[in-house]
Swiss-Prot record:
Gene name tied to this protein: guaC
Source organism per UniProt: Salmonella arizonae (strain ATCC BAA-731 / CDC346-86 / RSK2980)
Protein name: GMP reductase
Active site positions: C186 (thioimidate intermediate)
EC number(s) given by UniProt: 1.7.1.7
Binding partners and assembly: Homotetramer.
């Protein structure tokens, strides 16, 4: 046993210090980025935000809507091959370039993903997702996927430390998914005592990944557009959003009505709700590590996407970054004990 004395920080612990700027308008900010990935060699350009691979967020409908904003969607792994085929038959090539195919790490997952990727060559992204990216089996699966799909861009996680980030990149991942426990419907930290404050995880993993020519996606912990800006400021190449994109018309959650008001169910993918739906219940040897919440219906996701992108542009103007790529170079974090004036928050 040992204790690390270094203070680790989450998004709520900091603000971004404003700096002199020559920008005259938020419209001067370029949010699109272009990446060439280490292993696949593929080049992609767009806004580096990803809708999470949750079945109440990462839907085909979400992919269609967010492609119009140049945003990626990690489509959840529970669609059948037939459902994928039907989607591909109706989706444009532009939509498909904004889609990630999500998978687990079983032999059945591998075979199913191979079938999906064979449906259309425009599917260039694979998202290999497990709750705990520290297992040897997971690393071996990433290497297997890289060998099988050498030209596909592979995103793999989740981890929160530099050495494991390096391990995954060396095993074939182009992008490492960073985050254990920060999600709005994740209870891993409560159930297990395991986790890592998200901003510190992003900063440390970005440093490790960039040293090897890899990239990271900050997954979880964003509750408002300012958190997205902080994640990019901390060095994230991509930011994945779940709760911020849940509860919309395109989100895919079940709708319930109470006292004349409609709500949409949103749950973590290790929650009892998710396991009841997809694997027949919670196995006797494990505990659920997610919760289910009811969100007021929020309308089309386009309104939320515009709000997030507007906040991100504004953050860039406050530090003089004319491009999103420059934000991390111009970011100075200050530690704080408050984020906002909350006097009217309950009204």
């Amino acid at each position: 046993m040992r204790i690390e004395e270094d203070l680790k920080l989450g998004f709520k612990d900091v603000l971004i210090r404003p700096k002199r700027s020559t920008l005259k308008s938020r419209s001067d900010v370029e949010l699109e980025r272009q990446f060439t990935f280490k292993h696949s060699g593929q080049t992609w350009s767009g806004v580096p935000i990803i809708a999470a691979n949750m079945d109440t967020v990462g839907t085909f409908e979400m992919a269609q809507a967010l492609a119009g904003f140049d945003i990626l969607t990690a489509v959840h792994k529970h669609y059948t091959v037939e459902e994928w085929a039907a989607f591909i038959n109706t989706a444009s090539a532009d939509v498909l370039k904004h889609v990630m195919v999500s998978t687990g790490t079983s032999d059945a997952d591998f075979a199913k993903t191979a079938q999906i990727l064979a449906l259309n060559p425009a599917l260039n992204f694979v998202c290999i997702d497990v709750a705990n990216g520290y297992s040897e089996h997971f690393v071996q699966f990433v290497a297997k996927a890289r060998e099988a799909w050498p030209t596909k861009t592979i995103c793999a996680g989740n981890v929160v430390t530099g050495e494991m980030c390096e391990e995954l990149i060396l095993s074939g991942a182009d992008i490492v998914k960073v985050g254990i426990g920060p999600g709005s419907v994740c209870t891993t930290r409560v159930k297990t005592g395991v986790g890592y404050p998200q901003l510190s995880a992003v900063i440390e993993c970005a440093d490790a990944a960039h040293g090897l020519g890899g990239m990271i996606v900050s997954d979880g912990g964003c509750t408002m557009p300012g958190d997205v800006a902080k994640a990019f400021g901390g060095g994230a190449d991509f930011v994945m959003l779940g709760g911020m994109l849940a509860g919309h018309e395109e989100s895919g959650g079940s709708v319930v009505e109470e006292n004349g008001e409609k709500f949409m169910l949103f749950y973590g993918m290790s929650s009892e709700s998710a396991m009841n739906r997809h694997v027949g219940g919670v196995a006797k040897y494990r505990a659920a590590e997610g919760k289910t919440v009811k969100l007021p219906l929020r309308g089309p996701v386009g309104n939320t996407a515009r709000d997030i992108l507007g906040g991100l542009r504004s953050a860039c103007t406050y530090v003089g970054a004319s491009r999103l790529k420059e934000l991390t170079k111009r970011t100075t974090f200050i530690r704080v004990q408050e984020q906002e004036n909350r006097i009217f928050n309950n009204l």
